[in-house]
Design a protein with these regions (language model features):
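Non-catalytic scaffold segments within catalytic domains of secreted glycoside hydrolases
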Residues: 53-72, 178-185
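Active-site groove signature of glycoside hydrolases
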Residues: 24-51
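Acidic, His- and aromatic-enriched active-site or binding-groove loops in soluble protein domains
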Residues: 1-6, 60-71, 105-125
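Aromatic- and acidic-residue-enriched carbohydrate-binding clefts of CAZyme catalytic domains
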Residues: 1-14, 50-62, 165-176
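Short, solvent-exposed S/T- and G/P-enriched segments that are highly enriched in secreted/extracellular
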Residues: 270-276, 372-379
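Catalytic core of carbohydrate-active enzymes
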Residues: 75-87, 94-105, 118, 122, ...
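Catalytic metal-binding/acid-base residues of hydrolase active sites
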Residues: 44, 110, 139
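Active-site-adjacent "subsite" loops/lids of carbohydrate-active enzymes
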Residues: 1-34
Length: 382
């Protein structure tokens, strides 16, 4: 099958033919040798249902299964070249089993608020179907976003598992919109860099358990009826709730389950068990640490792959009397390097960390209380 639709000489490779798959893999390997570390496996969904396959497969069945073979072929080349656990795609199409070849993104959204909200709904649907990670075209793909839409999408995109600026007919670089867009993109990029110890630990959990890193509220709060219908917010890992702004007036609407929730950007605390409407500047988006949680932060904000333990710190968020909260830090090879446990009794929080030769600071959200440890135990008096 050959077409000249997007560029001359495009063709659909028959991955049921071992020689064809081998030929395609060799091309990918050449890219690796040039220094390419990840591959965008675009398309894969427009597979004709009247095609004849090398192995005689039913073309109706192959319409969905094709993308599995396509992504598998590319993923395995990357894994072979860079090592186990180092392969990464940016895949457009998927089917059952496709979660084994991450990451997937929702392609070709429009550059407007309604499409931004639809993008989140699609991502939550994907992650509810067993896919661990999700990305999207920051700023929208079709047309060109207004500066306000672009800035809100930057916040949403950087607080997704994976982040990429992308567009069809115009560049999505921030200086093409306005000066503040540069500031917004810089701020949320740095926030993501600081959150990497937390985010990477959550990614390791997703890899080992299959629990999606970005997920609808109902997956964590199955007994809270209100969480069954929430499609404009999500959990980013176990401890952070994100509520993007989908309105020109800057209002973020979100619901919080019971307990006190701490906004790691503004430092404000919100009561759970009810809905909230919060007006946000472009430098704000509700990113709320749930009650009885520990969120870890790294020492670097301008890079994403570093020693996550070096200069790291942790924040205990609204730990209730009699409750225990835990967190872990992994190195970039997914080896566990630190565990932290905090238990509250009355006005005293007992903190215990696994042994380490590096100092580690633990603070209490919304207060000036903190303690510095180098392995071992300590107490924080509230």
């Amino acid at each position: 099958f050959q077409t000249d639709l997007w560029q001359p000489g495009m063709a659909i490779v028959d991955f049921t033919n071992p020689e064809a798959a081998k030929w395609f893999a060799a091309g990918v390997r050449k890219l690796c040798e040039m220094g390419v570390t990840a591959i965008k496996t675009d398309f894969g969904e427009r597979i004709p249902t009247k095609a004849v396959y090398y192995n005689g497969a039913d073309p109706i069945h192959m319409h969905n299964y094709y993308t599995y073979l396509y992504n598998k072929t590319v993923f395995e080349v990357l894994e072979e070249y860079y090592g186990k656990g180092q392969a990464c795609l940016f895949a457009r199409s998927a089917t059952v089993g496709g979660q084994k070849f991450p990451v997937h993104w929702g392609g070709d959204c429009s550059a407007e608020y309604t499409s931004m909200a639809e993008t989140l709904r699609g991502g939550l649907s994907l992650c509810s179907s067993g896919f661990g990670f999700f990305s999207h075209d920051i700023g929208g793909f079709e047309a060109t976003a207004s500066p306000d839409v672009y800035k809100r999408w930057c916040a949403f995109g950087l607080m997704s598992t994976h982040s990429r600026l992308h567009g069809s007919t115009s560049y999505r670089v921030p200086w093409n919109f306005d000066e503040e867009s540069c500031d917004v993109l810089r701020f949320f990029t740095k926030l993501k860099g600081k959150l990497m110890p937390y985010l990477f630990a959550q990614a390791v959990k997703t890899h080992t358990t299959g629990i999606p890193m970005m997920r609808p509220m109902v997956m964590d709060y199955t007994d809270d009826i209100a969480c069954r219908y929430l499609d404009q917010q999500y959990m980013l890992g176990d401890s952070l709730l994100c509520a993007p702004v989908f309105r020109k007036d800057g209002v973020a609407n979100f619901y919080l389950p019971e307990g006190k929730w701490y906004d790691i950007i503004t430092g404000k605390t919100y009561e759970g068990g009810k809905y909230h409407a919060v007006t946000c500047t472009f430098m704000e988006m509700p990113v709320l640490a749930k009650p009885n949680s520990v969120v870890t932060f790294g020492a670097f904000e301008n890079q994403f792959e570093y020693d996550y333990l070096e200069g790291a710190d942790a924040m205990i968020c609204n730990l209730e009397d009699g409750k225990t909260a835990e967190a872990s830090i992994y190195d970039t090879k997914a080896n566990l390097v630190l565990t932290i446990q905090a238990t509250r009794k009355g006005n005293v929080i007992s903190v215990e960390t696994s042994s380490t030769d590096k100092t580690f600071t633990v603070s209490v959200a919304g207060t000036d209380k903190k303690i510095t440890l180098q392995g071992g135990k300590g107490e924080i008096v509230l």
